[in-house]
């Protein structure tokens, strides 16, 4: 039989050798050409090379500049922390195992890598949900006189960690499990088997409902209402130049948010669901590897979209990188003033700021 196997699991996968070996003990070069593992390692190195500096810079700049320490930015910092979890807990491990061609760190290492990668991804996902809810409540005002304060931010942080732990921790204690996936160099939830005693079916269904479908629905609802509010406000002000500019900025921001969310998570979720509903069917190892690494790339998309497109943060970041002096200060100041003029639909009120 073709595939890969380990303690208490067998995953059928297409290969021409007919060899079946444990991904914890032997190189999996019979599944994919060794060059593919080298390419995977190089890709993970690139994610580390980009993901660590941009997320670390986010933390450093926010701590250094007092005006960035706002309640909403607590959530943005949480997003950066989540991405760093993915970089250190997942990317470094995957790069190391890719260099060996199998999950050389064993079952314990698989549990650790799977847990931290899942935890980081879920913290990031639920942080985006909290941001979407905050933007909807503040801009669309379903609750009159609501002001997002420090207590709300702390509750939002606690919520993201609780939801992330509710997804990442159960496989460590027997409700499902972490096993090597794709090219067997990274670990994820067991979508592949119905092994007795692990209740994989119930966990996967729970995860897809509570940790994918619901967040996706919330994000689409909140940003859909956000766009409507911006259009209504622009129309009420007879579409002045500043409000039109704000509307364009917000529209571009929201479109990028939605596209990034779908690019990162929809392919992985779709392939995982297909594997879950077609257990026993053969599939190529690359079939799961490609979408899994699309999801990992969210550690780069998140800070670029949610932070680097924020003019106030960009101003502070440039000031920090240029040793306290911003060579573009005049341009940034004029842009900020323009945004302030369109206060009712300002992108500083719609985009995370």
Swiss-Prot record:
Q: What segment(s) does the record annotate as region Disordered?
A: 331-353
State which residue ranges cross the membrane.
37-61, 74-96, 111-133, 153-173, 203-224, 253-274, 287-308
Name the membrane topology term: Multi-pass membrane protein
- Give the record's glycosylation annotations as residue positions: 2, 15, 200
Disulfide bond residue pairs:
110-187
Gene3D superfamilies, alphabetized = Rhodopsin 7-helix transmembrane proteins
Which residue stretches are annotated as topological domain Cytoplasmic? Answer: 62-73, 134-152, 225-252, 309-353
Keywords, A to Z?
Cell projection, Chromophore, Disulfide bond, G-protein coupled receptor, Glycoprotein, Lipoprotein, Membrane, Palmitate, Phosphoprotein, Photoreceptor protein, Receptor, Retinal protein, Sensory transduction, Transducer, Transmembrane, Transmembrane helix, Vision
The family database entries (CDD domains) matched by this protein are listed as:
7tmA_MWS_opsin
Give the highest taxon in the source lineage. Answer: Eukaryota
Topological domain (Extracellular) residues are: 1-36, 97-110, 174-202, 275-286
What is known about what this protein does?
A: Photoreceptor required for image-forming vision at low light intensity. While most salt water fish species use retinal as chromophore, most freshwater fish use 3-dehydroretinal, or a mixture of retinal and 3-dehydroretinal. Light-induced isomerization of 11-cis to all-trans retinal triggers a conformational change that activates signaling via G-proteins. Subsequent receptor phosphorylation mediates displacement of the bound G-protein alpha subunit by arrestin and terminates signaling.
| The protein, known as | Rhodopsin
């Amino acid at each position: 039989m073709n595939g890969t196997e380990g303690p208490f699991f067998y995953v059928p996968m297409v290969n021409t050798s007919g060899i079946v070996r444990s991904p914890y003990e032997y190189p999996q070069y019979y599944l994919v050409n060794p060059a593919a593992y080298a390419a995977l390692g190089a890709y993970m190195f690139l994610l580390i090379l980009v993901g660590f500096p941009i997320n670390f810079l986010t933390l450093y700049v926010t701590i250094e500049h007092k005006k960035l320490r706002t309640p909403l930015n607590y959530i943005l910092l949480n997003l950066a922390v989540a991405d760093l979890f993915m970089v250190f807990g997942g990317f470094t491990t995957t790069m190391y195992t890719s260099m060996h061609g199998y999950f050389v760190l064993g079952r314990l290492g698989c549990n650790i890598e799977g847990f931290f990668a899942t935890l980081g991804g879920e913290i990031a996902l639920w942080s985006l949900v909290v941001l979407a809810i905050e933007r909807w409540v503040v801009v669309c005002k379903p609750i009159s006189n609501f002001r997002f304060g420090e207590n709300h931010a702390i509750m939002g942080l606690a919520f993201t960690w609780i939801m992330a732990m509710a997804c990442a921790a159960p496989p460590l204690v027997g409700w499902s499990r972490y096993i090597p996936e794709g090219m067997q160099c990274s670990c994820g939830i067991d979508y592949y088997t119905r092994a007795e005693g692990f209740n994989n079916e119930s966990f996967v269904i729970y995860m897809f409902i509570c940790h994918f479908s619901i967040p996706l629905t919330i994000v689409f609802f909140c940003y859909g209402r956000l766009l409507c509010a911006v259009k209504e406000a622009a129309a009420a002000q007879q579409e002045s130049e500043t409000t039109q500019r704000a509307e364009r900025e917000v529209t571009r921001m929201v479109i990028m948010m939605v596209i990034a969310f779908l690019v990162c998570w929809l392919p992985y979720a779709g392939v995982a669901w297909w594997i879950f509903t077609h257990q026993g069917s053969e599939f190529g190892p690359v079939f799961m590897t490609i979408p899994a690494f699309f999801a990992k790339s969210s550690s780069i998309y998140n800070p670029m979209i949610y932070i680097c497109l924020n003019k106030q943060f960009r101003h502070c970041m440039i000031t920090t990188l240029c040793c306290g002096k911003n060579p573009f200060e005049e341009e940034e100041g004029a842009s900020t003033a323009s945004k302030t003029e369109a206060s009712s639909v300002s992108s500083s009120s719609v985009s995370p700021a």
